[in-house]
């Protein structure tokens, strides 16, 4: 574990603890995730970022997309928080006055649905509760899960502005919602209309598009809807007998026989010659005696679907309704708000429409009206909150007119930056096609719409409360609409309301908003729509989108698949037993719990080991290498663990030499070698700093993490460590000089990586490996103006890289004589890099081989000697190695090459097979990645063979 030592210097600066009275953290201890977290908990209060250059500098506002209070945070939330916090720290380290505001969303339909499911498990159903009783239960849920989410948010170590936390139904946000609605209503932009909506019968409410899940049904399947087995994937052919004819009939194709009682016409295409003679005649309704319905023709009919004859059920199909309006067809509703049949026959009235399906099919069979039933693929629209089948239903709703609003957004969108840039085309296209927004919901949880009906006049007015409504109605009786607002209405105002609107009108745009691609149009676009109207400018200057997080096989993360990973389980670790226990405590049906448990056993047989917050954050960044997808599994964090642990262990390694300062002078070779290493590593660090800065500015987050990784693992852990091993062991004076250079580099590097891995970087910056002279009151981002970052020495980089490559190449030799101190074997080196000679003694010590320089002419002479093998290090340097030192290397390389070629042939055979197109997308993706990996390995081996050719 760490040891903490307090120095009791009385020096202070601006009321902040200065370096001399901070906690020193000793770095001798082995890498320990929990211990690092303990250290961070102690020193975090001493992390301060530079103050703005001007007292009047504007705030740099950042808005967290608020998590729903439906349950725990998931990986998508964690990714957004990690990206936003890294950017927040990046800008804070540059002196910006960052205010990163966290909050939670009341999530109307989502929360009410999850609470109702929770109550049902206890045997309590919504129809048994009053409105106040249900709202009381939801409020209790809100308090519990809001507290849980806030604790989770704190565990991500983000620099949240906790003094300004928000909730979408707190007083300030509620006032903002009322202000916005009333203003839009009075401007004539909010109106009431009777139109088709996505209706969830179980919720008895309209739902937004994001709450509609489209399921592809490719073959007949039985699905359970509200515990009722229902068959989907069938096309039913039903005969309608022509009036006045005993042997003529028209056959209709439908996937929904349960709506047949609402049929008021049948339609054909005007281009279908088969049915032209029937247009204008009447047919008998198959199940309603004495009801004749007309045969009409309409261009909306697809003559290639089924029989080419369409049954027209106006009140339960948008297409049918439009056809009915054009032909003055009667409209009859056969379904109530709960999805139960009405205005049908006594056999099915009152039945749930899906339960009634099989009974109606039997009635058709009894009347010899069912011609056939054949398998048929279709898209099934399901409510993601309840699992019920969505119905197109015409009901009065409140709408926001968007024509003028979207035009204003599009006018300003040329100033808006979108990342990735491909999203711009979708952004513009969506706004152009956008229809009026249905903003009302028929549930109890949410912002009750501040609109009141004047009962005597059947007129609506908008007011924030009853008293104001009475005033506007001049004392006439008023009644508030019971509907609540769509959740997205309140969250769309957050760029304003989270920062003080409407009390404060001077709200500056967010520099950026970062979120998942899946809510670009449900949330981000609607923020633009509303906030542009109220502030006269777009609410953000940039939109940064990340893809949907999927598992390692490319599948969407789903509880039913058992592939959902709780971010806290990765950070803190979890046993398989506790993962299963969490499933039981959730809202999944027992059948899904068993299925998920089996998936968990397969994916996490040993549970998940604790990774800590830094490894988790860095691992998420490494997952961002593709703009279109994020494939996540526990292997995603192995590189992150290697990075963080290597950083700690590297500091431990050099820390042992910090007290070895010695007045003895360095030899010329040592001085030149260490100087070259210093200049080369500083130069590499210069590239890394510039690369990371550019990556953050261009929102290439994977690149930033990758540059950090390459510098640490290649330039420091490999090149610097290997080329200084001789010096740290040779003398105290050279060991201290190597440590001093490393310490200076580490100090800059820790600040460079701080935005992504704040804990370990903060802890190490407060350790004694960083000299006191290097620390300051504020943690700023490295700049090229710093002394060591002014270095840009390409020559030193080339020399050092050649020295390292020579060392590694010679270490690969397998001669047992390598271990002999006598150095009986000589390797000849020809190079145009004169300073390379300063590394010869260090390389000789590490390899037990004698290095001897030769000219280009001597190289040609030795090449004629068949006892040497040419090894090309670079265009500047070649080695001539005794052949006896390569007894088996080329043989092994060729065997590996053959094995890889066989694997490649097998994959290519699979991917070129005729049936491969039907393979799941995750299989195709996996094979594609595997093929790329094999090709890279093949190329590496071919290069290795080339380097060792005679």
From Swiss-Prot:
Pfam family, one: tRNA-synt_1
Chief place where the protein resides: mitochondrion
Keyword Transferase: no
Classification lineage: Eukaryota, Fungi, Dikarya, Ascomycota, Taphrinomycotina
Amino acids binding ATP: 559
CDD domains attached to this UniProt entry: Anticodon_Ia_Val (cd07962), ValRS_core (cd00817)
Entry's Gene Ontology cellular component terms: cytosol; mitochondrial matrix; mitochondrion
Similarity-based family: Belongs to the class-I aminoacyl-tRNA synthetase family.
Protein name: Valine--tRNA ligase, mitochondrial
């Amino acid at each position: 574990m760490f040891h903490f030592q307090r120095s009791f210097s009385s020096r202070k600066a601006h009321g902040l603890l200065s370096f001399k009275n901070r906690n020193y953290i000793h770095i001798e201890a082995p890498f320990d995730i929990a211990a690092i977290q303990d250290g961070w908990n102690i020193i975090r209060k001493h992390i301060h970022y530079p103050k703005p250059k001007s007292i009047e500098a504007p705030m740099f506002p950042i808005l967290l997309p608020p998590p729903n209070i439906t349950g725990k945070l998931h990986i998508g939330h964690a990714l957004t928080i990690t990206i936003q916090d890294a950017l927040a720290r990046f800008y804070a380290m540059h002196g910006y006055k960052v205010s990163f505001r966290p909050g939670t969303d009341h999530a109307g339909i989502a929360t009410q649905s999850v609470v109702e499911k929770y109550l049902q498990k206890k045997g309590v159903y919504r129809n048994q509760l009053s409105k106040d009783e249900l709202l009381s239960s939801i409020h209790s849920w809100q308090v519990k899960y809001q507290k849980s989410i806030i604790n989770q948010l704190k565990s991500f170590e983000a620099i949240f502005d906790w003094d300004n936390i928000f909730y979408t139904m707190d007083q300030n946000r509620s006032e903002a919602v009322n202000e916005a609605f009333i203003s839009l209503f009075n401007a004539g932009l909010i109106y009431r209309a009777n139109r088709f909506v996505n209706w969830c019968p179980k919720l008895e409410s309209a739902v937004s598009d994001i709450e509609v899940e489209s399921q592809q049904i490719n073959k007949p399947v039985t699905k359970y809807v509200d515990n009722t087995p229902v068959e989907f994937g069938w096309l039913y052919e039903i005969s309608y007998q022509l009036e006045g004819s005993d042997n003529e009939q028209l056959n209709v194709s439908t996937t929904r026989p349960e709506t047949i009682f609402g049929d008021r016409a049948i339609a054909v295409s005007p281009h279908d010659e088969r049915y032209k003679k029937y247009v204008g005649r009447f047919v008998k309704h198959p199940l309603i005696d004495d009801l004749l319905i007309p045969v009409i023709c309409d261009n909306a009919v697809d003559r290639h679907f089924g029989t080419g004859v369409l049954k027209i059920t106006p009140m339960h199909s948008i297409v049918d309704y439009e056809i009915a309006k054009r032909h003055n067809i009667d409209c009859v509703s056969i379904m109530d708000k709960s999805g139960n049949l009405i205005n049908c026959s006594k056999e099915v009235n009152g039945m749930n429409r899906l339960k009634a399906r099989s009974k109606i099919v039997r009635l058709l069979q009894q009347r010899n009206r069912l011609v056939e039933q054949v398998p048929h693929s279709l898209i099934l629209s399901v409510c993601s909150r309840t699992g019920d089948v969505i119905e197109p239903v015409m009901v009065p709703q409140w709408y926001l007119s968007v024509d003028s609003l979207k035009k204003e957004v599009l006018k300003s969108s040329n100033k808006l930056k979108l990342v990735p840039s491909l999203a711009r085309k979708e952004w513009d296209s969506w706004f152009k096609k956008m229809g009026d927004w249905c903003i009302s919901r028929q549930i109890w949880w949410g912002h009750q719409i501040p609109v009141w009906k004047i009962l005597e006049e059947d007129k609506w007015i908008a007011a924030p409360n009853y008293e104001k409504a009475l005033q506007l109605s001049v004392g006439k009786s008023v009644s508030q609409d019971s509907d609540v607002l769509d959740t997205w209405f309140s969250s769309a105002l957050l760029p304003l309301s989270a920062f003080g609107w409407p009390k404060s009108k001077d709200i500056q745009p967010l520099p950026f908003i970062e979120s998942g691609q899946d809510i670009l149009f449900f949330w981000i676009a609607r923020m633009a729509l509303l906030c542009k109207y109220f502030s006269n400018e777009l609410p953000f200057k940039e939109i940064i989108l990340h893809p949907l997080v999927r598992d390692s096989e490319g599948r969407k993360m789903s509880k039913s698949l058992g592939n959902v990973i709780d971010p806290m389980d990765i950070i803190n670790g979890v046993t398989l037993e506790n993962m299963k226990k969490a499933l039981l405590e959730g809202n999944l049906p027992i059948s899904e719990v068993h299925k998920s448990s089996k998936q968990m056993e397969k994916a996490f047989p040993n549970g998940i080991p604790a990774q800590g917050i830094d490894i988790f954050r860095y691992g998420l960044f490494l997952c961002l290498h593709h703009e279109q997808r994020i494939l996540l599994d526990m292997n995603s964090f192995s590189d992150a663990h290697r990075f963080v642990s290597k950083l700690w262990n590297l500091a431990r390694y050099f820390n042992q030499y910090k007290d070895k300062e010695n007045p003895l002078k360095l030899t010329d070779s040592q001085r030149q070698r260490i100087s070259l290493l210093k200049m080369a590593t500083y130069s590499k660090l210069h590239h890394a700093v510039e690369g990371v800065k550019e990556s953050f500015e261009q929102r290439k987050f994977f690149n930033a993490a990758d540059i950090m990784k390459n510098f640490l693992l290649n330039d420091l852990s490999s090149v610097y460590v290997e080329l200084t091993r001789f010096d740290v062991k040779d003398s105290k004076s050279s060991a201290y000089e190597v440590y001093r250079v490393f310490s200076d580099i580490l100090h800059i590097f820790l600040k460079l990586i701080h935005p992504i891995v704040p804990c370990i970087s903060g802890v190490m910056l407060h350790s004694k490996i960083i000299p006191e002279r290097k620390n300051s009151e504020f943690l700023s981002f490295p700049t090229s103006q710093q002394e060591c970052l002014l270095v840009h020495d390409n020559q030193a980089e080339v020399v050092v890289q050649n020295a390292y490559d020579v060392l590694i190449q010679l270490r690969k030799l397998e001669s047992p004589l390598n271990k002999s101190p006598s150095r009986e074997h000589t390797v000849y080196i020809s190079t145009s890099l004169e300073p390379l000679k300063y590394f010869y003694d260090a390389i000789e010590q590490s390899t037990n081989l004698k290095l001897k320089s030769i000219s280009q002419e001597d190289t040609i002479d030795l090449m004629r000697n068949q006892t040497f093998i040419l090894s090309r290090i670079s265009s500047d340097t070649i080695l001539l190695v005794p052949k006896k030192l390569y007894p088996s290397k080329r043989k092994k390389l060729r065997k590996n090459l053959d094995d890889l070629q066989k694997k490649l042939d097998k994959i290519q055979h699979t991917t070129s097979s005729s049936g491969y197109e039907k393979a799941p997308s995750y299989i195709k993706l996996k094979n594609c990645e595997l093929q790329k990996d094999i090709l890279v390995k093949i190329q590496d081996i071919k290069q290795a063979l080339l380097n060792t050719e005679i």
